[in-house]
Regions:
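Conserved HGGG/HGGXW glycine-rich cap/lid loop of the alpha/beta-hydrolase fold
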Residues: 4-53
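Structural signature of beta-strand start/N-cap positions in the alpha/beta core
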Residues: 13, 40, 79-81, 104-105
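Aromatic pocket-lining residues of Rossmann-like dinucleotide-binding sites
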Residues: 35, 95-99
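Active-site loop/oxyanion-hole signature of alpha/beta-hydrolase fold enzymes
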Residues: 42-81
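Short beta-strand immediately N-terminal to the catalytic nucleophile in serine-hydrolase-like folds
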Residues: 82-84, 109
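Gly/Ala-rich beta-loop-alpha elbow adjacent to hydrolase catalytic centers
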Residues: 84-92
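Flexible "cap/lid" loop of the alpha/beta hydrolase fold
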Residues: 97, 103-135
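Conserved alpha/beta-hydrolase catalytic His-Asp/Glu region
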Residues: 117-122, 134-161
Length: 161
């Protein structure tokens, strides 16, 4: 794993996590300049994804442990923000959930919507908002909401990290 760093180290740090099989420059190259106006910007390039390394991606947990070590070593265990899309969103979630480091603001994106052209993102958003709004607000007693509540009350298997 490599972390590419850009900008002024005195600014708040934001760490970017690309999606599955995505080259970090393809995901974030077009936003680095603007982000550097406000943030010290770090972009993670996962093991096995970087052209400068001969490594293998083992697992999400393996990469998370490397990122935790990096943040502890370089930033005393705390960064201002982290953004992850797709696979990167999973890694950001794990970083927050494990509580081995501190991230003030964790942003979890979906490569389907946050990287789509505006016209497509608007259509996708128009479809998704009516589906998820009841779950987020709890204001709508729709069939899906009742079904989800019933499923949550039953419990089930969960993965431990």
């Amino acid at each position: 794993m490599k972390v590419y760093e850009f900008g002024d180290k005195n600014k708040p740090g934001i760490m970017l996590f690309p999606g599955t099989c995505c080259y970090w420059k393809s995901n974030f190259g077009h936003v680095l300049e603007n982000l550097q106006e406000h943030f010290y910007t770090m972009v993670v390039s996962y093991s096995g994804f970087d052209e400068t390394e001969n490594t293998t991606f083992i697992s999400e947990l393996d990469e998370v442990e490397k990122v935790e070590a990096y943040i502890k070593n370089k930033f005393d265990g705390k960064i201002f923000a982290a953004y992850g899309c797709s696979l990167g969103g999973s890694l950001v979630s794990l970083l927050v959930g494990r509580q081995n480091i501190h991230i003030d603001h964790a942003i979890i994106g979906s490569s389907d919507m946050d990287q789509a052209p505006k016209w497509l993102a608007k259509i996708e958003t128009a479809i998704m908002i009516p589906l998820f709004y009841p779950f987020i607000t709890g204001k709508n007693d729709c069939f899906l909401s009742r079904k989800m509540d019933k499923r949550l009350q039953q419990g089930g298997e969960s993965a431990e990290y």
